[in-house]
Amino acid sequence: EIVSLSLSLLAVVPLVVLVIAGPLNVRGGTPSQQCNTGTPQCCQQVQQTSDLQQFRSSFGLVDALAGASALVGANCNPVSVLGTGNGAQCNTQPVCCTSNQMLGAVNMGCMPLNVNA
């Protein structure tokens, strides 16, 4: 009787271990070279909206940017995440923008994209 109990436990224990281990969910933030929304952008100019008085008036955006506190990118192009193709070389800080374009040249709500991590 003890032998059959031992064999039963020997058969059940591996199944219990498999159920407990189960599939592993990889958790964490967005990889550093990706954006939560939109695609990575390389803009010719990236500045805080609070520093853009001249930029605002030249694009006629005084009212639109008056209360904003995010980064604004001008003349942005998509960046290839793998470092190849159009926009692979970015002379300014790559950014993720919320794709709120104004006048086709200004991207609002941008955040720096860390490509070194």
UniProtKB/Swiss-Prot annotation:
Disulfide bond annotation, renumbered to this chain: C35-C96, C42-C90, C43-C76, C97-C110
Listed PROSITE patterns: HYDROPHOBIN (PS00956)
SMART domains for the chain: HYDRO
First-listed, main subcellular location of the protein, grouped into a coarse class: secreted
GO annotation, cellular component aspect: extracellular region; fungal-type cell wall
Induction: Expression is not regulated by ammonium and glucose concentrations. Expression is down-regulated during preinfection stage (12h) of ectomycorrhizal interaction with Castanea sativa roots.
Keywords for the protein's UniProt record, in alphabetical order: Cell wall, Disulfide bond, Secreted, Signal
Localization per record: Secreted; Secreted, Cell wall
Superkingdom classification of source: Eukaryota
Recorded GO MF terms: structural constituent of cell wall
InterPro entries registered for this protein in UniProt: Hydrophobin, Hydrophobin_CS
Signal peptide (UniProt feature, chain positions): 1-21
Assembly: Self-assembles to form functional amyloid fibrils called rodlets. Self-assembly into fibrillar rodlets occurs spontaneously at hydrophobic:hydrophilic interfaces and the rodlets further associate laterally to form amphipathic monolayers.
Annotated family: Belongs to the fungal hydrophobin family.
Job description of the protein: Aerial growth, conidiation, and dispersal of filamentous fungi in the environment rely upon a capability of their secreting small amphipathic proteins called hydrophobins (HPBs) with low sequence identity. Class I can self-assemble into an outermost layer of rodlet bundles on aerial cell surfaces, conferring cellular hydrophobicity that supports fungal growth, development and dispersal; whereas Class II form highly ordered films at water-air interfaces through intermolecular interactions but contribute nothing to the rodlet structure.
The protein's name: Class I hydrophobin 2
Provenance organism: Pisolithus tinctorius
Organism classification: Eukaryota, Fungi, Dikarya, Basidiomycota, Agaricomycotina
